[in-house]
Regions:
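Low-complexity or membrane-interfacial segments used for flexible interactions
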Residues: 1-77, 82-90, 96-101, 106-200
């Protein structure tokens, strides 16, 4: 069992770099500032890395791994991936064994970021909605009950953490029942960042 996946509040801090071919994020304990996980994009080959600096980066496939670093371990517990796309993104989330947990399907023709959250069978089980700035997101179930939030600011975090628009706090509500749904919520800010900010 991964302690990282059982957390209800996680701070996400992007690695900042002017010329970077792969995105990376630290996952921190909000109370202590300790790094408890790492999110790393895997970009293979010189050609693919060079394509990341062109207009084609908005269409390219991506594969991202969530590493649990708690207790001295380094275990891949989640993956987030998308194939090459022309228009609407469909992002697949799987656990460390490759079992599909669900998918995020981008909603087209929307001013603010919006994505349907699907179970492995393709049923709509939740909805991810962002504000027009793309900084704050609400994760709701099919009945519009809030299951969690992804926010740019949180009262429990020091201001020194917020040095980039791509730093977030994930807050999972007790109402978010089911391990798979909690893991999809954990993947939500990285998915939104890749689709709407890094790749939009």
């Amino acid at each position: 069992m991964s302690a990282l996946l059982d957390r209800s509040t996680i701070f996400v801090r992007e690695h900042v770099g002017m010329f970077k071919a792969a995105n990376a994020y630290d996952l921190l304990d909000p109370a202590t500032g300790a790094v408890v996980g790492l999110v790393q994009e895997r970009v293979g080959g010189f050609f693919r890395k060079m394509m990341k600096f062109t207009q084609w980066k908005t269409r390219m496939s991506f594969h991202i791994e969530f590493h649990d670093l708690e207790g001295g371990r380094d275990e891949v517990v989640l993956t987030v991936s998308r194939p090459f796309t022309w228009f609407r993104s469909v992002v697949t989330v799987a656990d460390g064994t490759g079992r599909v947990l669900g998918r995020f399907r981008q909603k087209l023709l929307s001013i603010s970021p919006k994505m349907w959250v699907l179970d492995p069978a393709g049923n709509e089980v939740a909805f991810l909605k962002g504000d027009w700035k793309g900084w704050n997101f609400t994760f709701t179930d099919a009945a519009a009950h809030v299951l969690g939030t992804v926010t740019k600011k949180w009262a429990g975090i020091g201001k020194e953490f917020f040095t980039s628009a791509d730093n977030y706090v994930i807050d999972i509500s007790p109402a978010c029942q089911g391990a798979d749904l909690r893991r999809l919520l954990l993947a939500a800010p990285i998915t939104a960042d890749m689709v709407y900010k890094e790749y939009a």
